[in-house]
């Protein structure tokens, strides 16, 4: 386990909603970080990813994606998590798993630039941290993507992440393959009545997406073309 000092790292809290469902909120209790209805989406995303080999996961949350990853035949499972309350849950969960779990305590934005290990599978689901402000979830993902393609991607590695909007991407097909799957989700109407903020991107849609990138070559062979992701 690797750890280092990061401020503002006790912002999330585990709670139950009025239906006794698990949720993770910010410190105010008014903004939802993760909700129980996301479980089926997370499981579907991991099923599309089909993780193998060495896995890097960003964020633990309620553990939905981590539990799904552990059902596959993997070699190792590295999770980067910064929040103290979430880390406590993660440390209780990790020893009980079938496959080895490596915990890195801190912000992935801090740690990833110096990480040299290569991985076969990636799952990315972060939440804004005040020490690393970003204009959007997409910008967070783009920075993560640009970091891993430089040095962390094995040949035939796959990347999936939580994304609610459809957007265009123009990767060089020599280096990678892009797949976008539609997912119809059942967002409870009562969310808006529970005293928690319904995610803004979910206000008017039941359809979200599961993006999968498959890298045809490893990091050393990709070059600058691998950086050409475009949001549309």
Predicted regions: what they are:
Residues 2-232:
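The AdoMet/dcAdoMet-binding core of the Class I SAM-like
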């Amino acid at each position: 386990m690797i750890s280092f000092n990061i401020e503002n790292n006790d912002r999330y809290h585990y709670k139950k909603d009025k239906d006794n469902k698990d949720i993770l909120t910010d410190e105010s209790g008014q903004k939802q970080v993760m909700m129980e209805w996301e479980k089926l989406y997370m499981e579907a995303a991991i099923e599309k990813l089909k993780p193998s080999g060495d896995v890097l996961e960003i964020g633990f949350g309620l553990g939905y994606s981590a539990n799904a990853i552990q059902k596959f035949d993997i070699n190792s499972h590295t999770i980067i998590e910064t929040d103290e309350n979430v880390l406590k849950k993660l440390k209780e969960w990790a020893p009980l798993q079938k496959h080895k779990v490596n915990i890195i305590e801190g912000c992935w934005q801090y740690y990833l630039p110096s990480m040299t290990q290569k991985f076969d599978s990636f799952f990315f689901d972060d939440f804004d941290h005040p020490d690393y402000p970003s204009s959007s979830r997409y910008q967070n993902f783009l920075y993560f993507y640009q970091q891993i393609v430089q040095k962390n991607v094995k040949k035939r590695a796959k990347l999936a992440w939580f994304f609610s909007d459809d957007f265009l991407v123009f990767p060089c097909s020599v280096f990678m393959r892009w797949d976008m799957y539609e997912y119809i989700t059942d967002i409870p109407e009562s969310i808006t009545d529970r005293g928690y903020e319904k995610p803004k991107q979910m206000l008017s849609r039941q359809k979200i997406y599961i993006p999968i990138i498959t890298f045809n070559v490893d990091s050393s062979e990709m070059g600058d073309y691998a950086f050409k992701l475009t949001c549309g």
